[in-house]
Structure formats: structure tokens, C-alpha cells
């Protein structure tokens, strides 16, 4: 096992920024849906509720945080349907800022089922999983992880639980919970930013170019 070459470029920059990143993945059943259909979806309703949460806004103020909402590229045309009521929240259209930069700057990631969780976890930052539509998503998409047993971050099915977990993370200065710090050693064979070199060595061993 070599780990991904792209992880060599990941540097934790969070000490210089007070940013939270939220990046949910897409839903195949909403792909290319009309705006009228999208606006009636649980996806839109739940993320809109989060963005308009008074409790969340108070936490952002209290801990001097900026909340970056970065929509999946397959849903980029829907971002105009979202709005925020706080200058501590930013709606970032796909491509406007490099995703890896947002991941490096964030103190914590909120996602649902997106594989970006691995990049953030690689940097040993806390991840919160917001899975309000888990039953439907699991039925249609399935998963390579057991979402009830194998996640490396606190899981919530409701907004209240998510905000409880987020508030606790704020109070703990976004320190990785001990249980997930220990788990990290079993998830990554290496965390030394030498993955590219290992990949090259393994390719040479295969003697593909002889």
C-alpha cells in the first residue's frame, strides 16, 4: 500500500485560518433535476436549514469562525438556490477556489458520504458526518464503509445532533478525538508525504517499461 500521491501536497494550514468546510456529495436521484424538484428535496431542505440555523450562527460568532459551503461539481448549477444570512458564511461555487486549499485551511470538515473525508482525516483533522438521508442513500448508492461502525468521525442523522457535535468540537479547540486519532493509524499505512516516491518505486518493481 502506498497511499495517494496527491496527499503529499496536503499541509495543515488551519492554525492560520478560522474556517470550517462543509462539502456534501451529490445525489444521483437529483442529478439534472429541475430547480422546482431540487427545492423540494430533503437535500436542499436540510442544508438550507443548516445554513439558516440561529444556533450555528451563534457558534460561528462565539468562536470567530467562517463557514465555507462548497457544493459538489455535479450540483454546481444549484448553488444559486442557496442563500445565507450571516457574513460568516460563504457559498463557494465549484471552481472558484481550489478544494485542496479549502481542505488545508479548515479546522474541521462536515460532510455526508463524500470521499473528501479521507483527505481531511489524513491531515488528522476532525470530520463530522451528517447523514439525514442515510436509508435512501444507502439503498441507491451503497457504501464501501459500514456507516454505522467504521466512520472516523461523529455521525448524526439530525441537525440537533450535528450541532451538538460541532459545538463540542469548538469547545475542544478542534482537537481530533482520541478514538479517531488511534483509528487513524489503522486507516493509513503512511502519513509522511512520501507517497509519490513509493508509487514510483512500486512501478519500477513491476518492470513495465522493460
Locate the predicted segments by residue.
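Structural alpha-helical scaffold elements that stabilize or flank donor/cofactor-binding regions
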Residues: 59, 101-102, 148
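C-terminal alpha-helical cap of glycosyltransferases
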Residues: 192-210
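Catalytic binding pocket for nucleotide-activated donors in carbohydrate/polymer assembly enzymes
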Residues: 82-84, 115-187
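Short, well-ordered alpha-helix to beta-strand connector turns
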Residues: 17, 105-106, 124
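Short, charged, surface-exposed secondary-structure boundary motifs
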Residues: 11-12, 99-104, 138-144
